[in-house]
Amino acid sequence: MYCVIMAGGRGTRFWPASRKNNPKQLLNIVGNSTMLQMTVDRFQKMKNVEDIFIVTNKDLAPKINKMINGVKKKNIIIEPSGKNTAPAIGLAALKIKSIREDAVMGVFPADHLVIGAQKFAKTVRSAIQISNKNNALVTIGIKPNFASTGYGYIQFDPQSTLDYLAGFKVKTFAEKPHEKLAKRFVSSGDFLWNGGMFVWKVSSFFSELKIHMTELNSQLEKIEKKVNANQDFSSLWQKIQPKSIDYGLMEKSDNIYVVKSEFDWNDLGSWDAVFEVSPKTKDQNVIRGEGLVIDGKNNLIESDNHFTAVLGLNNIVVVNTPDATLVIPRDKVEDIKELVSYLEKNKKSGLL
């Protein structure tokens, strides 16, 4: 399998720590390495990974090349501009196709936490086998442990199991549900979280793209020669319409299987998620860096550059950086995106 790591996102929900020039995937969110380096290391240890590619933007590429070990400079694929996930994955598929047309490629986010390396490797092996056996598009589904309204869901057919591979035919993809519907999904037993991880043969991907995303497929065909010749293709790229791989392809194809994950997973999509996975004091506070909580519980302090104190407050997130401070209730952290939008509209570029 050729591994493709998607590393072009901005991580706006992690403001003020995450910025355009140093986004979430390049931060030490958990552990001693950046999220991207942890992801690269995970795949380097897998025997069936032939090579690793990173897809990112032109602003982050030089930094990634310097910071990340284990990925060749020529394997850093640069998008001229952000076009959402479908074009980015298509660009990576062109690169891999030029190496081996019958290759299997796996697409994975750069910034998710995976616990259980052997179980993860087993799940990916099953996905590879299904993609080869059925010429199918395969996604990896996460077994839900609560009724989340923050993830999309995948419904599978329980009767369509593939021998010992824990793979099932996908019935539907569902967008992020409201709480009542999320509870119904989880209680039904035939829904999984959509973790944004995909495995397929390059040839199968382009066959499905030709059917369901005809315009994108045509544009990628025009770009292919320039990509293979290492020529500039930015003018052709600008004509591509942004679209997600879920909406553009996965929700439309009828040849999709899902493999149930056997590993522990967290997309670390917010500061609250960081709180949940981090070691805590006896009062259930998380203190990362220099900080103190008195008469308060369930707080998160992220403050590397100076001392931060919280007194008499519960369920608060405090993030300090050299030029900005965020104070927000833990149950409101999803609203950070609105704050970032405000900064953009008011041209506060120095804070972005």
Language-model features: locations:
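Conserved N-terminal catalytic core of the sugar/cofactor nucleotidyltransferase
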Residues: 2-5, 13-16, 20, 31-109, ...
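Short beta-strand segments
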Residues: 6-7, 55, 106-109, 139-143, ...
